[in-house]
Amino acid sequence: MVQSELQLQPRAGGRAEAASWGDRGNDKGGLGNPDMPSVSPGPQRPPKLSSLAYDSPPDYLQTVSHPEVYRVLFDYQPEAPDELALRRGDVVKVLSKTTEDKGWWEGECQGRRGVFPDNFVLPPPPIKKLVPRKVVSRESAPIKEPKKLMPKTSLPTVKKLATATTGPSKAKTSRTPSRDSQKLTSRDSGPNGGFQSGGSYHPGRKRSKTQTPQQRSVSSQEEEHSSPVKAPSVKRTPMPDKTATPERPPAPENAPSSKKIPAPDKVPSPEKTLTLGDKASIPGNSTSGKIPAPDKVPTPEKMVTPEDKASIPENSIIPEETLTVDKPSTPERVFSVEESPALEAPPMDKVPNPKMAPLGDEAPTLEKVLTPELSEEEVSTRDDIQFHHFSSEEALQKVKYFVAKEDPSSQEEAHTPEAPPPQPPSSERCLGEMKCTLVRGDSSPRQAELKSGPASRPALEKPHPHEEATTLPEEAPSNDERTPEEEAPPNEQRPLREEVLPKEGVASKEEVTLKEELPPKEEVAPKEEVPPIERAFAQKTRPIKPPPDSQETLALPSLVPQNYTENKNEGVDVTSLRGEVESLRRALELMEVQLERKLTDIWEELKSEKEQRRRLEVQVMQGTQKSQTPRVIHTQTQTY
């Protein structure tokens, strides 16, 4: 009340005038009253009315050519009849700043006119017009960096924002001075009235904010659409490296990475594997006509189909992450297709070779990779051979083959744990899981084949080496991949490698014994149950060296079993060999159980992370929608 009295005194001209005019309005009844014959109010009324009705329009017309819109910062309760009630967030149209009282403006808010204190509203800074656009460009810029899908969408939206924000400003400046025309324009503008009735800048800001979340929501929806294709890796890979994420959003466009790693890649790789497998099978057929070509061809086909299945999820797992990798890995033609997702360093390519093309590819591709290493490794392998000493020269040769080929693989596998840590683990997890399923699916029929043909064992030894080589390279790489999957440092990964290596080392001894056992399958039937890994180590070795002189190397193993049958008949202790094989089998089963546990744990972690990310995305989407809806409702209430 004190404020109102203080304000009334300086505003005696305005407020007292209004009050006296109201009093005179009360006197209207007194005009017809015979007790009050005073005529003085009559002649005085026109000037008052004229001062109110005719004096203010000129001011209004003077200022309305550039109408200003202010936003109310604080609530204001009117204390006089001519004051305007303000609510926080309302938009006030300033009709005149030249009132009789300093610090008071005349304006219109929600269809009511009146005066209000100027410090209750926020003046529109002219510079702020550009801020929303800059904010939009800044918000879209970081989106462009991590996501290359955004440049197409963000640029047009920025242009739309520019046009949208400039549109209202043009409409604002082109308004006619008359009040009715303003009302008409505001009504005609409909939902766009928010621009004309309430700050052209703030709606622009709202649009910018609403459009950028929409962009994000579109991209997130696309990512969710692609997430079933990408499998869990989508959830994990954004965190490890953001160089990968920029290339991910194209994945929805590429779908199962059809553009980046074209479908021909998936097709030619089988073709290459088949052709190379045929090459490998040709020497096999030349050395021994026992091996029918169909035996080898189906195995490549078998390998092709599961690996294609594996390759499709792999390629879709990290389609764009491998773009950088594909270029270095393409030299290794075959496995760059199916293994490229798991590769982020060329050393990793050396491991996938057995995985990818264990049949015939393993021979040429591995040799390309390993030939520089074979000389050193053969030196070390010969040391190992001397360490393992076997009486017969054939045994030594065979051990050389085994060790020379186990050690390259083992050393490569030992190298690989160092290379993969930069690789996002999720891709390798998926690879490991895919290959585990393949190993389980492939090894059982192959063991059945092994058990089914004991009599024709010498003849089948060569196809089965390749078949088992497929199972082993798949299983061995799965070990390699699981170690990086757990994101263990190389020190932790190497112990696993060392667990495999001792078993490989034992396999070198016992694979020789196996070779002794395998030829006379009639005598030693239980040996056919030897786990695929052991044989695969033995047979992984064959495809590696054959290319230089494939006929000789393949012929040697075929001759060695016959000599071994003679040696065995001369007195090899079969029971000790069985015991060793059993111990090896148990160790391998333990490893398999452990790896399965780890895989299940990793799979559960990935599932939980996937769910968490989906929840977060849903929350973000809901939050953006909630934040958008009140603004939209608010602008609509202001326009009407």
UniProtKB/Swiss-Prot annotation:
Q: Which UniProt keywords apply?
A: Coiled coil, SH3 domain
Q: Which SUPFAM superfamilies match?
A: SH3-domain
PANTHER family with a match to the protein in the record: SH3 DOMAIN-CONTAINING, SH3 DOMAIN-CONTAINING PROTEIN 21
Report any one BP term from Gene Ontology: actin filament organization
Protein's name according to its UniProt entry? SH3 domain-containing protein 21
The UniProt entry's coiled-coil ranges are 572-626
What is the scientific name of the source organism? Homo sapiens (Human)
> InterPro entries per the record?
Endophilin_SH3RF, SH3-like_dom_sf, SH3_domain, SH3D21_SH3
Where in the numbering of this chain does the SH3 domain appear?
65-126
Q: Where is the composition biased (Polar residues)?
A: 210-220, 621-640
Superkingdom = Eukaryota
Per the record, where are the segments of Basic and acidic residues compositional bias?
A: 177-186, 401-416, 459-469, 494-532
Keyword Coiled coil part of the UniProt annotation: yes
Task: Give positions of region: Disordered.
Answer: 1-60, 133-361, 401-551, 618-640
